[in-house]
């Protein structure tokens, strides 16, 4: 197998007046063999390894092991998967933002650059777990429930507002917008993402890790 499998699988796609680069599984199959029968979820992971292959965190052997999964349907190593994004809800997401803030404080004490402490992947935090229903059955119920929610959790929301401004790749979906499952499916998720890297637009499939057991699985492949 070529030691430059990442480059060997790189292809281009023209969309209107923009050129996108992506990592083609059919091109990779010329070196890896038949991968057509891999589960779709593993194909997404395989593209991820091709895109991030650097010879250290992702090696030829890592890619070959995943491509050959059908031989025994068993993994003999960890998969160095980098998710396209992270989805949090407020119950588990707030402590993570507190940790990031604490890390920045530690870096500041040591004389370092606090702006370097940021999420490596884009993070969306959806505020939905603390919303309660005090009013119902009338036209003003929604607005009144949101107002009470903001009053009861004012300090939390001020902290999250600071986090949204302080950290790059971090956004907050305010209360009253909807639950994580709905917001993820209808607003946040995309089939394909694109990102400018070293002067090139790279297109890649959506993938997601979340902070609870089920939120991220809606409409998922596996």
Language-model regions, residue ranges each:
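Fe-S-dependent hydro-lyases/dehydratases of central metabolism
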Residues: 1-222
């Amino acid at each position: 197998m070529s030691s430059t499998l990442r480059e060997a699988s790189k292809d281009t796609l023209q969309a209107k007046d923009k050129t996108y680069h992506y990592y083609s599984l059919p091109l990779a199959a010329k070196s890896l063999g038949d991968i057509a029968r891999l589960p779709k979820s593993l194909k997404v992971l395989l593209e991820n390894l091709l895109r991030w292959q650097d010879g250290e965190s992702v090696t030829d052997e890592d890619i070959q092991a995943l491509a050959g999964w059908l031989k025994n349907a068993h993994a003999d190593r960890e998969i160095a998967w980098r998710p396209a994004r992270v989805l949090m809800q407020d119950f588990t997401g707030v402590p993570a933002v507190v940790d990031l803030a604490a890390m920045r404080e530690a870096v500041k004490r040591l004389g370092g650059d606090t702006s370097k402490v940021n999420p490596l992947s884009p993070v969306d935090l959806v505020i939905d777990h603390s919303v309660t229903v005090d009013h119902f059955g009338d036209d003003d119920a929604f607005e009144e429930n949101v107002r009470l929610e903001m009053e009861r959790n004012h300090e939390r929301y001020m902290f999250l507002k600071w986090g949204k401004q302080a950290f790059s790749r971090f956004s907050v979906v305010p209360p009253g917008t909807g639950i994580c499952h709905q917001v993820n499916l209808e607003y946040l998720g995309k089939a394909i993402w694109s990102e400018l890297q070293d002067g090139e637009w790279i297109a890649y499939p959506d993938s997601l890790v979340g902070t609870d057991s089920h939120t991220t699985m809606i409409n998922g492949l596996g």
